[in-house]
Design a protein with these regions (language model features):
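N-terminal/domain-start alpha-helical segments
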Residues: 1-87
Length: 87
């Protein structure tokens, strides 16, 4: 299984990468919207997406990546406002 990790926090991105690789998954990393557009393709089976990227909204990015293939996603956010979490 190939998992795309789109997270701007280096420490969290590396922790997710290490944990998933230790469990046998293949990962593709991106630290920004721009990197995700460049690195993530339709070969991924799951996306882990930070909602608050420095160069764009993670939800809009996810919708853009969905154009060629429907990919399930887990969204991450550091925001604790209920409105943001329900988004």
């Amino acid at each position: 299984m190939r998992i795309g990790i789109i997270e701007d926090d280096n420490l969290l991105r590396k922790a997710l990468d290490t944990s998933l690789k230790n469990q046998g998954y293949t990962t593709i990393l991106a630290g920004s919207r721009k990197e995700a557009i460049k690195n993530i393709d339709s070969s991924v089976d799951l996306l882990i997406v930070d909602i608050g990227l420095p160069d764009g909204d993670g939800i809009n990015l996810y919708q853009e990546l969905q154009k060629n293939k429907k990919i399930p996603a887990i969204f991450l956010t550091a925001k604790d406002d209920e409105k943001d979490m329900l988004k």
